[in-house]
Amino acid sequence: MDKHARICIVGGGPAGTSMAMYLEKNGYDNYVIYEKTGRVGGKAFSPKMMVKTKDGKEEMRTIEMGAVMGCGTYFAVHECEEFGGATHADGPAMGRRFTNVDGTPLKSSKLALLKKYMKMKKLSRLLKKKYKGYDVNGHRGVAQGRYEGPCPSPEMKLAHIEGENPNLKDLCLPFSEFLKKNHCEDAELVWKGPFTSFGYGYFDEIPAAYVLKYLDAFTVAQFLSTGNLWTWKNGTESIWQGVNAHLKHPVVLNSEVTAVDRSGEKVVVTINNSQKEEFDKLILCTPLELFLKYGDPTDEEKELFSKIEHKEYFTMAVRPAEKDAPDISYYYFANMTPETRGHLMVFYHRWPDCGPQPLVTFTLRNHEGMEDIPFEEAKATTLKDMEISHLPVEKVERIDDWYYFPHVSCKDYAEGWYDKVEAMQGKKNTYYAGEVMSFGDMEETAEYSRDLVRRFFQK
């Protein structure tokens, strides 16, 4: 491809900013990134709020309203850190307590914990032996029993691999059925904490591929041992602010792409319903289903993108009374079920060296085939759950209602949705990236941007 091609990147989140970084590294620096909001980072959002230190002093510190953590397999995120000057070396230590709905500690016998650990090890061995290629970034070929893409294992460190493995077709099953098929049902408890509580859905509805590509065996082990997790003192948002600050062409903020015309040789993009710009290539790094509203979708794009679903997930920064302030994050496993959607699943206590501080609650409102819990009802339920935990909320600092985890159903996954979309890459001078093409977390999204550049924008 012509290194001077003018490239339009839609979206200034992790997908878009990392895309520009990797394009630059391959010699493509004639790009423009448009972001409709006034900041970069997308769901990596770390506003500052008042906390009290242990000696009673008030300080402004970052609070995570979206992405919270990473781990040792975040190779693409680490490349972004190095490029932009961010670091996870000084982030606050993670801690957690598994609790009953009333906030009392959830007691597990040593035997029960041992059984859970053994089930995790059993599934980890099975994945390595039977499902080679399951952890490769992206979804190309999975429904046909193939794997192709960067491998995020500690040994491979995003090296490209590809091959055939008919067993990978099992990843189209709901994760609960996948576990049942492999006699590993108890492993669900291990995977549920970092998956369902952070808004990615329930295991009876979500294809196993999403679960296991995000939470491969090594990553799950990292999540179980909180001491290995990465956090950022300046917040996850600082990663993408750093990348943006070091790009040759920083993100153009407050600039919404409101129309796209691909009828000619060039791609004509309209910004904020007024300014028109011509480009040679278009890279979509925002939800593809939204392109149906502002773009000029083909019949194939309409058919495929209309099948994308997403999760109704919101976070709230809340303050309980100072006398009630907890000293650690709480996980409520009893509330991580389809029947308890709309309830508090976890709250994040960010600063262990501080006393009273905003706690961030995480609540999921929908399940495929079930009625959505209305936002106001879920908000009231979440606040009531805090009260039941003996942490009545005195003030809600802010609420972020996220457009979360775009994905496709098990049926559409099995019918080759991803291979159909991947076959469109480059047609009409358009490329597709962002969360739905990999997974809705920082690392998977950045890995996909990295690989898209490798595939189509060679050095």
Where are these regions (language model features)?
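Conserved Rossmann-like nucleotide-cofactor binding loop
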Residues: 15, 39, 289
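Mid-domain catalytic core of redox enzymes
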Residues: 26, 258-372
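Conserved FAD-binding subdomain of flavin-dependent enzymes
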Residues: 43-46, 52-91
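Conserved flavin/dinucleotide-binding core of flavoenzymes
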Residues: 348-459
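Helical element adjacent to the flavin cofactor pocket in flavoenzyme catalytic cores
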Residues: 216-266
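Mobile amphipathic helical/loop "lid" adjacent to a hydrophobic cofactor/ligand pocket
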Residues: 78, 82-205
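Glycine-rich FAD pyrophosphate-binding loop
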Residues: 24-50
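N-terminal Rossmann-like FAD-binding beta1-loop-alpha1 element of flavoenzymes
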Residues: 5-33
